Amino acid sequence: MDKFIIMTMLLVSTNAYDRICIGYQSNNSTDTVNTLIEQNVPVTQTMELVETEKHPAYCNTDLGAPLELRDCKIEAVIYGNPKCDIHLKDQGWSYIVERPSAPEGMCYPGSVENLEELRFVFSSAASYKRIRLFDYSRWNVTSSGTSKACNASTGGQSFYRSINWLTKKKPDTYDFNEGTYVNNEEGDIIFLWGIHHPPDAKEQTALYKNANTLSSVTTNTINRSFQPNIGPRPLVRGQQGRMDYYWGILKRGETLKIRTNGNLIAPEFGYLLKGESHGRIIQNEDIPIGSCHTKCQTYAGAINSSKPFQNASRHYMGECPKYVKKESLRLAVGLRNTPSIEPKGLFGAIAGFIEGGWSGMIDGWYGFHHSNSEGTGMAADQKSTQEAIDKITNKVNNIVDKMNREFEVVNHEFSEVEKRINMINDKIDDQIEELWAYNAELLVLLENQKTLDEHDSNVKNLFDEVRRRLSANAIDTGNGCFDILHKCDNECMETIKNGTYNHKEYEEEAKLERSKINGVKLEENTTYKILSIYSTVAASLCLAILIAGGLILGMQNGSCRCMFCI
């Protein structure tokens, strides 16, 4: 009875203490993240790092508006296909949009030497200005030749606007003619020319009189001579003849000289290139030009996002997230989401971080829960929460910085002869993309692991800080809480939370309460010892009586005899 009274007093006394617990936020989020050692870890909040949304339009960028070539290929614009006259005026662009199904290319059948490089050089500029290089009205030739293969938009035969088809002058004269142009402009000029290869000798003499001709094009760095390759070819656009097209760059101060007695498609206009653009020619059939502005333009559309990664397109320009071949990379920006254990026991005592998170904490990640004679309360610790949030912000910036190595997959364009190079290039690009995606995923896994470890450490640090503040004035209950050995009203609780608690102020009261606890424990231990001794003695006596009784009974019925030998 005495023991029961003592234990009851201890239980009532223990649960009557004012209590403060340290805990962390939990919520009903279903977000999960992966770490280096765990998969699908529940967390209170995550940030998606991969942008998957895009606006299906080609927008203006910080460098200006795109140039849509409409029905024309870029080589048709450069050489001046008569059906592309809309582009004759001086124009500028941030990038160029070319439709793959555009019908207008080189109107007279033939091929452009180093076309891919020409496309690159031309598109890298921000604008052009057409410059007249030569006036052939003073030459002893007939200028402005036309062809049925190059009809104008208005109908009727025509020819390229940037080069001039020179033929013999009646009656049958085509002597050597030559001309000179000096580049006195403020920049480099792209100049163009061609060589005509008739299908037979009859057409050769009909156009140029001379059966054997020689044309030369020279600059400070170019020295080329050409003779026609006469012979029949398959009919293309109504022509058995062919033209080879050429181009060059005339730098500022350099001189261009041309000389011919036939078959030269002579340079007439050049392009003075100015500025720098994104240097891209986007080939897409369906995406329209939009009335929009973007910092990031991909081949698949515009992206306006602050995320560090995107999977919309590996071809992009401007200030874009890095391309990764991943659908999702989630970064933990909250806590490990551990639902709290329901209160148990006689008095439903509040519990700390050992028992799980608190769903009621909405204004911070870490904080306190207290109970005293004035009631209960919960408050976030703003300092530790803000420090954790700052670290998360730094983590996002850290990921961006670590992935900031320049990596862009350029849309390489190769001729039919170089298709093997194109195939090898695509394989290399694919391998680089796989490696880049692996690096990004590994970096996120590392940061997630570090984040969750830091959160655990932050809660433990806050707990240890409160322990130091309370000193010997409280008892660690082992579940993230402290039972305070003195009366602690709300004002007192606030000092514990904000770090201004003075343990010496309550030291005497706490010592007295601790001595009472120790006294009760001592009395309890003494009672246990006395009861233990009594129990041992009683058990021994009972055993002795049983043995003696057994012997006496056995001797009475003769089953047991005692023999004494002398």
Where are these regions (language model features)?
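Membrane-engaging insertion elements
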Residues: 358-403
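Membrane-penetrating hydrophobic segments
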Residues: 321-355
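Transmembrane-helix exit/juxtamembrane "anchor" motif
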Residues: 370, 374, 546-565
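Cleavable N-terminal signal peptides of Sec/SRP-targeted secreted and luminal proteins
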Residues: 2-16
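Long, extramembranous regulatory segments enriched in acidic
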Residues: 18-63, 69-74, 95, 230-334, ...
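Single-pass alpha-helical transmembrane segments
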Residues: 352-359, 534-554
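Extracellular, disulfide-bonded carbohydrate-recognition/adhesion ectodomains
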Residues: 17-240, 247
